[in-house]
Amino acid sequence: MKNMKNTVSILLFLFVFLSACSDDSIPEKLKPEPPQPDVEEPNPDDDSENCGNNQNSVLPALSVVGRYLKNEKGEIINLHGFTQTYSPFFNNNAWNNYDVQGCLNYNKSMVDGILAAGWKFNFVRMHLDPYWSDDPAMQSVRYEGHERFSEFRFRKYLDELFVPMAEYFMSKGMYVVMRPPGVCPNEAPYQGIELGDSYQQFLLKVWNIVSQHPKLKNNTGVMFELANEPVKIKGTDGTYGSTGDGHFQNLQLYFQAIVDKIRANSRNIIWVPGLSYQSSYAGYAKYRIQGENIGFAVHCYPGWYGSDAEEDVAKG
């Protein structure tokens, strides 16, 4: 998978709560009452389950403030790192098939080697690779598609592979940005994504599972990137595209539903894709993603913009 740099853009909402005191008169005579123990009354709007950090957290909490990530001291934190995927094909066939321990051993050794060489990374983009969650008995429909997704296999290897690998990264001081299995539909038999389609249902299921996981929920070292490029959506006019007002209008609705699903479970930082190869975001200025601790997962490929050329190639 290609490396990218994440750029943050988010609105924070501050809520001011006003309270009032009653002006009821005091009765002339009060009967003494026995002392009552202090009992905390239940609050129907209590969100205590989502308050406080996961006890498995080992990294300082970060939050999205304007266009920056900041720590609890208000200092700007820049993340720089790499991406890692877990198919043997992309890892020199270093292990056989579904050998979990072989996969862990190899990828941990890669991390150790990178750090030993002196690279100062503090985050990794972790692909929850569909190699593990696909049902191999089903026919493949497209490259890294969602059609063969097995919830049983996903839960199994989330526990056995992805969470242990994430814990290893965090033990090395690296934040983990998880992305879902595979890529958005972008080739036959699809023209792209659309509101209410099977891919949106797939993402809702994946993130509902991940955001409720006891070792990931509210873990200060874990963030969620909702989907992976390329992103082409059916707009309000019925056409599929990656630009224009109508496409952004539906894109906001598409990803807002997933944001809301995650927020019902956890407070982890969320990274929202844009259109095209996650390079188009202007429409979000009008059709805003609502919520806190949300940024944009902007993908930028320097080579495409001519950084590898001896002369200006006028790309971009």
Q: Locations of the language-model features?
A:
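Feature marks short, surface-exposed loop/turn motifs that line or immediately flank catalytic pockets
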Residues: 85-88, 127-134, 184-186, 230, ...
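Sec-dependent signal peptide recognition
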Residues: 5-12
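Mature N-terminal segment immediately following signal peptide/propeptide cleavage
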Residues: 63-83
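Bacterial Sec-dependent N-terminal signal peptides
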Residues: 16-53
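Structural recognition of the beta-strand scaffold that forms the well-ordered cores
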Residues: 76-84, 122-128, 175-179, 222-226, ...
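Aromatic-lined substrate-binding rim segments of carbohydrate-active enzymes
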Residues: 96-185, 200-204, 251-266
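Short acidic, Pro/Gly- and aromatic-enriched capping/linker segments at domain boundaries
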Residues: 52-68
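Extracellular glycoside hydrolase catalytic/binding regions
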Residues: 59-62, 86, 90-106, 191-223, ...
